[in-house]
């Protein structure tokens, strides 16, 4: 009988302890949310921050490097990441994950693609017949339609900031034998990519830029080039020859390992958060098309989409 009573007491203590943890109030310390250098990520940071604030949490935003942020999360300097793009940041994410201190917090509904492509009017004007097949880029007549003053007589591809992918695209161009006809330049920011789309159309020349989906361009007419398919290990950094495009990838969330303990309610809400391609594209469009500030875009998105985000808090 004593053993039964002792066992029942232990069970009661366990249940009470678990309930105490699950119902614990979030810490008053701010939830530190990172911002990077593309619109959807910054707007979503403020969307998520707004949701946390509606729950009574304090929020702090910090501008961080998009590769180094996972180490910052692991060490506890940043609380979470809400846009972990597989192609660009998967390696940095996995490295931090393997060290411990960072936790995979699930995927968004949206799937991602990050690669080089062109606005649809490039094909409509016949500037490079054969696209989106990458072999169309082997034609000198195609390349000459994409020259710019800084391209040395070659067709120019405009990559994103070099901090995003390093030399991935230049390595691919050389590996595919396109280096004699094409050169890769790096944009200073995402805004520079969108400015290039406007400038190229105004000047009547072709343009190939780095882009991604989900993004505001999903509804504006943009096509990704069909490079040879991605396979595990095909990139130079993994020992491959570099003759491959980008993978169809995840869009993950990540948190510091202590976040579910310090902010259990916010962590549970963040776990439930899952945005679709259309949600994320709309966030970006409010800034890149409608020219709103990131903060105002987030406020508008939250006001217009209560039915989307309110269930995350339940």
Curated annotation (Swiss-Prot):
Residues binding trimethylamine N-oxide, per UniProt: 38, 85, 114, 164, 212
Compartments in which it is found: Periplasm
Outcome recorded upon mutating residue 212 to A: Severely decreases the binding affinity toward TMAO
Alphabetized GO MF terms: transmembrane transporter activity
Effect of residue 89 to A: Severely decreases the binding affinity toward TMAO
Result of changing residue 85 to A: Severely decreases the binding affinity toward TMAO
CDD domains found in the cross-reference section: PBP2_BCP_2 (cd13643)
Result of changing residue 38 to A: Maintains a relatively high binding affinity toward TMAO
Effect of residue 114 to A: Abolishes the binding affinity toward TMAO
CC terms in the record's Gene Ontology section: ATP-binding cassette (ABC) transporter complex; periplasmic space
Disulfide bridge partners, by residue number: none
N-terminal signal peptide: 1-24
Pfam families: OpuAC
Keywords in alphabetical order: Periplasm, Signal, Transport
Protein's job: Part of the ABC transporter complex TmoXWV involved in trimethylamine N-oxide (TMAO) import. Possesses a high binding affinity toward TMAO, but presents little binding affinity toward betaine, carnitine, trimethylamine (TMA) or dimethylamine (DMA).
Assembly behavior: The complex is probably composed of two ATP-binding proteins (TmoW), two transmembrane proteins (TmoV) and a solute-binding protein (TmoX).
Protein name, as recorded: Trimethylamine N-oxide-binding protein
Native organism: Pelagibacter ubique (strain HTCC1062)
Classification lineage: Bacteria, Pseudomonadati, Pseudomonadota, Alphaproteobacteria, Candidatus Pelagibacterales
């Amino acid at each position: 009988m004593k053993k039964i009573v002792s066992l029942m007491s232990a069970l009661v203590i366990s249940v009470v302890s678990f309930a105490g943890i699950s119902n614990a109030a979030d810490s008053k310390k701010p939830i530190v949310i990172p911002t990077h250098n593309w619109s959807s990520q910054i707007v979503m940071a403020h969307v998520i921050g707004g949701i946390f604030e509606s729950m009574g949490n304090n929020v702090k935003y910090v501008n961080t490097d998009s590769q180094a942020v996972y180490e910052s999360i692991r060490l506890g300097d940043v609380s979470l990441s809400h846009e972990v793009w597989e192609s660009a940041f998967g390696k940095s994410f996995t490295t931090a994950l393997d060290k411990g201190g960072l936790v995979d917090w699930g995927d968004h509904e949206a799937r991602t693609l990050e690669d080089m492509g062109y606005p649809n009017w490039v094909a409509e004007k016949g500037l490079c017949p054969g696209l989106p097949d990458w072999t169309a880029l082997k034609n000198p007549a195609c390349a000459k339609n994409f020259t710019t003053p800084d391209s040395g007589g070659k067709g120019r591809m405009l990559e994103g900031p070099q901090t995003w992918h390093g030399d991935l695209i230049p390595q691919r161009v050389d590996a595919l034998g396109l280096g004699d006809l094409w050169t890769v330049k790096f944009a200073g920011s995402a805004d520079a990519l969108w400015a290039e789309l406007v400038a190229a159309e105004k000047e009547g020349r072709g343009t190939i830029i780095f882009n991604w989906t989900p993004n505001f361009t999903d509804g504006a007419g943009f096509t990704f080039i069909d490079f040879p398919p991605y396979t595990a290990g095909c990139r130079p950094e993994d020992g491959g020859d570099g003759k491959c495009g980008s993978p169809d990838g995840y869009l993950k969330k990540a948190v510091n390992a202590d976040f579910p303990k310090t902010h259990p309610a916010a962590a549970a809400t963040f776990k439930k958060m899952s945005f679709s391609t259309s949600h994320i594209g709309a966030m970006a469009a409010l800034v890149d098309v409608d020219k709103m500030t990131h903060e105002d875009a987030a406020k508008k998105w939250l006001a217009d989409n209560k039915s989307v985000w309110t269930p995350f808090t339940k």
